[in-house]
């Protein structure tokens, strides 16, 4: 195992591309906050939410669900064999939620008023208040859950030991808060039955969003672990290397069952609402692509990979699972929203909107690499191996 190599050249193709994206992102950020939202986006009165909400927020929150899924598996359900996956998952979740809040500032007309719902005008009957309160609280919980890695790196043993004793309480808080805001993000669309296509609109949207967040968390842990195993293999210790395949098989099995259940309740929902006739339309074909290609197929591939012990199949299924979550959030927030409007009034993101979203994702990856290459995330600190 090797840690950060300060002698290694920073002028690699990957770092150069990353640097270009970050510089362009900073330029677009300056334009956004000096010229206004209209200068860098195609948002309007018909389409007030674009990819900054549909991708950066809805997808970001869902894909960061690996934090509560992994910590609950290890600390609440006693599956200690997944302990090595907890810190990478918590780190990803913490960065995901942190940059969700960062990205939200781009979408707000008055970014400085972001804390208003918490400290000035609560609006306690609003779902957005509940989402904002839960996300802010859960971000704090994630920071505390992640902090032992930083404290071990800094050598602050006493503070670290105090924080570790709070693990179980923090995990319970994390699961409760995640259940609330993951489902509430789906509930936001309940107020727009005439704007959201019937195949995606349902009174069970909160349930769908929560269950699909579990799929996102399980798939993201496998996907992220596969990337880390390939690109940061030299930073892992023997425990992480030995337990990596077990995490893939265990989470793959769980994802297969959750996806199968999700598929069944989606079919039941369409049946209850008598929406089958919409399948003969273009939107119906797109719904079938989502359900068959990114729900049923990955569920089958997860089951096949686990049964046949084919780790490559499971990793491919995790890619489909992640893409399926992105596709679902895009469909609900963008593609199937305002479906009745003429084509010339529909929303398509400005290239600067896309550029800012790419900047946010690149920032997450860059910060994760910085943390993982210096702090005990992919390995156990030798001074704390017996102090869990």
UniProtKB/Swiss-Prot annotation:
InterPro entries: FDH_cytochrome_b556_subunit, NrfD-like, sulf_resp_HmcC. The chain crosses the membrane at residues 10-31, 57-78, 89-106, 130-144, 166-191, 199-222, 254-265, 291-306, 316-328, 354-368. Pfam families: NrfD. It comes from Nitratidesulfovibrio vulgaris (strain ATCC 29579 / DSM 644 / CCUG 34227 / NCIMB 8303 / VKM B-1760 / Hildenborough). Its main location: membrane. It is a multi-pass membrane protein. The keyword Glycosyltransferase does not apply. HMWC (high-molecular-weight cytochrome c), ORF2, ORF3, ORF4, ORF5 and ORF6 in the HMC operon form a transmembrane protein complex that allows electron flow from the periplasmic hydrogenase to the cytoplasmic enzymes that catalyze reduction of sulfates. It comes from the Bacteria. GO terms for biological process: anaerobic respiration. GO terms for cellular component: plasma membrane. This is Protein DVU_0534. It is found in: Cell membrane. Belongs to the NrfD family. The lineage of its organism: Bacteria, Pseudomonadati, Thermodesulfobacteriota, Desulfovibrionia, Desulfovibrionales. Keywords: Cell membrane, Membrane, Transmembrane, Transmembrane helix. NCBIfam families: sulf_resp_HmcC.
């Amino acid at each position: 195992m090797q840690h950060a190599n300060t002698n290694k050249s920073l002028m690699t193709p990957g770092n150069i591309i990353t640097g270009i994206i970050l510089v362009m992102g900073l330029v677009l950020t300056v334009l956004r906050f000096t010229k206004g939202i209209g200068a860098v986006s195609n948002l309007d009165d018909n389409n007030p939410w674009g990819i900054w909400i549909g991708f950066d927020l809805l997808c970001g929150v869902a894909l960061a669900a690996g934090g509560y899924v992994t910590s609950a598996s290890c600390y609440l359900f006693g599956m200690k064999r997944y302990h090595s996956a907890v810190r990478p998952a918590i780190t990803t979740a913490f960065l995901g939620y942190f940059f969700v809040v960062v990205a939200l500032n781009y979408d707000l007309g008055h970014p400085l008023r972001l804390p208003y719902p918490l400290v000035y005008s609560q609006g306690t009957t609003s779902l957005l208040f509940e989402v904002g309160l839960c996300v802010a609280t859960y971000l704090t919980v994630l920071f505390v859950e992640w902090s032992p890695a930083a404290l071990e790196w800094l050598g602050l043993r006493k503070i670290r030991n105090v924080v570790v004793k709070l693990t179980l309480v923090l995990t319970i808080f994390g699961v409760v808060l995640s259940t609330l805001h993951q489902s509430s993000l789906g509930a936001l669309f309940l107020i727009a039955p005439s704007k959201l296509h019937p195949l995606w609109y349902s009174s069970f949207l909160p349930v769908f969003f929560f269950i699909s967040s579990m799929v996102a968390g399980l798939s993201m842990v496998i996907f992220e672990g596969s990337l880390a195993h390939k690109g940061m293999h030299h930073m892992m210790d023997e425990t992480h290397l030995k337990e990596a395949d077990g995490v893939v098989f265990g989470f793959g099995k769980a994802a297969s069952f959750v996806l199968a259940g999700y598929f069944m309740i989606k079919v039941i929902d369409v049946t209850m609402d008598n929406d089958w006739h919409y399948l003969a339309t273009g939107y119906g074909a797109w719904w079938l692509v989502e359900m068959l290609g990114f729900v049923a197929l990955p569920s089958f591939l997860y089951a096949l990979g686990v049964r046949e012990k084919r780790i490559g199949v499971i990793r491919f299924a995790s890619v489909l699972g992640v893409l399926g979550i992105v596709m679902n959030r895009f469909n609900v927030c963008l593609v199937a929203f305002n479906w009745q409007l003429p084509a010339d009034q529909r929303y398509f993101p400005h290239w600067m909107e896309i550029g800012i979203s790419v900047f946010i994702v690149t920032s997450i990856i860059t910060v994760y690499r910085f943390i993982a290459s210096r702090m005990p995330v992919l390995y156990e600190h030798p001074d704390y191996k017996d102090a869990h």
